């Protein structure tokens, strides 16, 4: 599946002195070239080992004006020497909740379906079953209409579908 991904391009120097400069530059470049609403950053084995501090780096990028107004950078730690790819996926999903979920004390009769490591077809089936049960749900992440879609002959950098950031903000008010 075509997924837009970028790298901060560690060099020998950043391997020794840290990747802060590279990541701040990458954040600026990604926002200026690709114009996403959100950038999700995760660490690697090397950035974890040398001690890069994502909170500090993203704060620095914001202070320097590298994150445009209304845009967001979410992040999490995913050292490859802890757990597996599933652990990293779970950490990034937790970051989605941490950075977006808010509670207004107005409970919504909605069930949050937090999707674990699974295929888009499995997500689609879970949503279908919930629909048959007439349950109001919000699945996140939701890759059913973003990945596992028919070929149209036209490339879309950001396919329509999934859970929006506005929907993610409501998860703190869900009943379950």
Model-based region annotation:
Residues 1-176:
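An N-terminal assembly and electron-transfer interface module characteristic of large anaerobic redox
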């Amino acid at each position: 599946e075509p997924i837009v991904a970028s790298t901060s391009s560690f060099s020998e120097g950043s391997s020794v002195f840290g990747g802060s400069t590279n990541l701040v530059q990458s954040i600026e470049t990604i926002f200026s070239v690709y114009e996403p609403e959100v950038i999700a950053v995760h660490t690697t084995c090397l950035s974890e080992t040398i001690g890069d501090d994502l909170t500090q780096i993203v704060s620095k990028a914001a202070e320097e004006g590298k994150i445009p107004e209304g845009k967001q950078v979410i992040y999490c730690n995913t050292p490859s020497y802890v757990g597996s790819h599933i652990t990293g996926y779970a950490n990034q999903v937790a970051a989605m909740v941490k950075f977006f979920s808010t509670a207004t004390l107005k409970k919504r009769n909605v069930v949050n379906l937090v999707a674990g490591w699974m295929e888009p077809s499995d997500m689609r089936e879970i949503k279908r079953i919930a629909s048959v049960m007439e349950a109001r749900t919000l699945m996140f992440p939701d890759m059913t209409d973003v990945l596992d879609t028919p070929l149209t002959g036209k490339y879309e950098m950001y396919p329509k579908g999934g859970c929006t950031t506005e929907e993610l903000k409501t998860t703190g008010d869900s009943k379950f």
